[in-house]
Structures are given as structure tokens and as C-alpha cells.
UniProtKB/Swiss-Prot annotation:
The gene is pgi. Signal peptide: none annotated. It catalyses: alpha-D-glucose 6-phosphate = beta-D-fructose 6-phosphate. CDD domains: SIS_PGI_1 (cd05015), SIS_PGI_2 (cd05016). The keyword Isomerase applies. Keywords: Cytoplasm, Gluconeogenesis, Glycolysis, Isomerase. This is Glucose-6-phosphate isomerase. It comes from Treponema pallidum (strain Nichols).
Amino acid sequence: MNWRNLDECAAYARLQAIRAPSLKTVLCGPEGIERVRRYCTDAGAGLRYHYAAKTVNEEILTALAALADEQELVAKYDALRAGAQINTGEKRKVLHHLTRLGVQGSSLASLPCEVRDMHAFYTKEYERVCAFARQVHEGGLRTSRGAPFTDVVQIGIGGSDLGPRALYLALEGWAQRHQAVKMRTHFISNVDPDDAALVLSKLPLETTLFILVSKSGTTLETLSNELFVAHVLRQAGLEPHTQFVAVTSETSPLANNPQYLASFYMDDFIGGRYSSSSVCGAVVLTLAFGPQVFGHFLSGAAEADRAAQEQDIRRNAALLDALIGVYERTILGYEHTAVLPYSQALARFPAHLQQLDMESNGKSVNRFGIPITYKTGPVIFGEPGTNGQHSFYQHLHQGTSVVPLQFIAFQHSQLGQDPIIRGSTGQQKLLANVVAQIVAFARGKEHADANKTFSGERPSSLLYAKALTPQTLGALLAHFENKIMFQGFAWNLNSFDQEGVQLGKTLAQHILAGEVEGVLRAYADLFDLAHAPTC
């Protein structure tokens, strides 16, 4: 495989020379109906990717296919899955796909022995998680006072919180409808003491199980919250070691610690933001909904992973989505992307994608540490529809910057409690707004009053399925993970480290240790941090 910068590719120069089509012409003109029918492809597990409202045409799609070939995007994806050392900065493999590979013999047989061993390790840990969850649900594991556990709290931050929390919220309604709710579930992430205090104030402390998630075992915020919770439990006359579970690595200070009821392990080959399908997400979600639900989620993710191996970009939704995103960011210069799920269940999904995308591809040097001159990962933001329509859509429609949009929608609601009101159901109203927004952003509107004129030409895509189920959620998560990795390959980035996270953390440690001077001291003095207690 060859690793080269994007601007060294012949297809890149070709894309720069092609004039982008007008959406008013290609989508809203006489060929629009046929375009809507054709510009769509499967993404796995019933999920579909629709790109008719993107500013691409046959010429651009051909050039994007050439770029995919020139940058060997699928070959690099296959190499990653086979255990190549893709994380160059930290000299590590990238193996989160193995956590949802299951026991597919044909898939495993082609993998190197070392990778098969890692798959066996991940599978063993997942089986331990399932056994532990069944023990809790069936009453085999109880509190120190003999009561069954009723609630579970995940304590973690970053990838140990954003992904698992987003997935839990996404499945909560589905689980209620299908009577799959096993335990009430909560999350603590911020080191802000009000976060933990507020969550704990609403809990039956005696019957709550706490999951501490830190791969390194040294995460400041997570360890601080653990001690906060332990303090509150002791004040209530409870013993913390009878109510804590750890999720960490086998080399962390938390490993094999008798102060935890159980410990479950991951490794350095699974990055935090890619860890939702590992034990990082499995423990809390299996306790919340049971092993079968999480198993269906994994199967949906595995199906999307297999779809991402397709060479033809028009049959590979993640690859096509990635290439169009590279075209919009680097060729057209669009700086942002809005993720707009028309499902309240996905309320926190944009926040997870924000970390997944911006921490992966928010880089200004290539995978060899050499500065690059072209634009890379966009700023990601989003909010569920129709809430966002009453918030920031004004800017999206009439602002001076074009923001590509990624809509997500489902034909049916999760709970099914949807009476006809004023001639239509709530779900019909929701979906009518999705359709209206796609066309409105593309077509715009002319008016004699400039203040009421909409320029249109605002590109969007649509990911949709019949319903948000565990399988479609797994495919949705894997689609974005694979999309972001493909983009990193195209830009020649290392999408699996996060050096930008470290600088501020290091300075904060100096401040708390009183090792400050100059402007750092001046800002610290605003909060009287020089006189903060140290123990």
C-alpha cells in the first residue's frame, strides 16, 4: 500500500477542475425524480444512504471512485481489519471491528493468528459480561444487604461516556416497547461535582451498581468521580467495594483489584471513541437491556462493516459518504457538517459523532507527522429535528456559510404511541419536515424582498430505515466509524490518536499542583486556585 497526501493524487487535481452541479438543476429539475430513485445505496441492516441532494453528478462520482482507487481506501480498510499497524503515532493495531465480528468462521479464517487471538480475547470478555448481567438480572448477585440491584450508573468520560450514553438513549424507547428494560440506567461524566451530586440525589443508593470505565486507569475526571461516589456511599453506611465494577485494561492500576465486584478488560488496540461495541459499552448496555439486545446491536454493526468492504463506491455507503465529505470539505471548502437526526432517541448521537469525527480527523499533520496544506475534518454539530428547526436552521438556510447536512430518519416511531392529531400522526409530521427541509435547502425560494429570499444550493444526505432498532443502530454507528476512517485514509491522517487532548490536561495538572507563573497564574488567580485545598 502507498500512503500519500491527498494533493499528490491525480484524482484530486481532476476534482478541482470539475464544476459542481446546481442542485436546483439536477435535483429540482426534470431529472430530479429519477435522481432520487437512483442515488441511493444499502448501508447494512436495513439502513439506506441517500445522496440525491448532494452536489455531485456522474463526472464527480467517477472522479471520487478514481480517488478511492488511487488512495487504496478499501485496501487500507481491509488491512486495518486484518491487524496492520494503522495507528502510526502510537504504533498500535486498530481492532474495534473484532468486537462485533461474532463467530463467523469464514471471516476469522482469513485473519492472522495474532488477530484471531485478540478476537478470542474480546469474545471471552463479552461472554463474561453476558454471564455477569444474567447473574445480576436473575438475582444471583445482590447488594451487601441482600436486595436485588435496580439501577446502574456508568462513570466515564469521552469515549467511555458519549458513545454508550448515546446508544442507551437510542434504545431506551425500543426496549420499553419490547419489555426489554432490565435496570434503570444513568451516567456520570463531568468532573463538575454538580453532575455526580445531581445523579446520586435521584438514586436508591443501596441498590445501585456503579461501573467505573477507564482504559488507562488514570483518567482524572473518572477517578475523581469514583472517589466522590464512594464518599457518598460511605456516608449512607454502604461499602463501595460491594457496588463497583471496573472496565479497564489488564495493564492499568485498576486491573485485578479486589475493591471491585468484577473487572472486564479491553486493550490499547481499541481507541476510546471507537469503543462502544467493546466492553466499554457492553457492560452498561447489557445490564440495561440484556445480552440479546446488545447482541443484535453487534450484528447490525458487523453487517455494516462487511458492506464497507465493497470496492464499488456506489455500493459502499460508508465509502461514498466519506468521499463526498472529503469533496465538500477539501474541494468546496465547507467548514462544518450538521448531523440532524429526526428522532428524539438520537438526541445525544450528534455529540458522540462530534468526538468520533473531530478527535479522529481534526489534524494538521499527516500520518508521518508532516504538516499538510489542505483542509481536513469539518466541525460537527447537531440537534434532533424538529427542535433544530426552531434553533439554528435560520443560519443553515440564509447564513453566509454553506453547511452540508446529514439527515437521519425512520419511518416508524419506537414506542408506537402516536394518535392522529389534526389529520396526521406525530411521526408523519416529523417525516414531512425531513422531506420539506431536504427540498427547501436544495431549491431555495426567490422573493422580491431580499430578506425573504433563500439561495438554496445547500447540500444534504439522508440515512434512513424503517425503524430505529438495535440492528439499525449498530449499522448506523458502524457506518459513521467507517466513514470517518475512510476520510482519514483519503487525507493521509492518523485517525486513531489524539495528541490535541493532552496539552490542556497537562497544564491543568500543573495548576492543581501550584506550579504556575505568568499568564497561567493570572488566570488561575481569577478562581483563587492558588489557595485550593490539595488533599
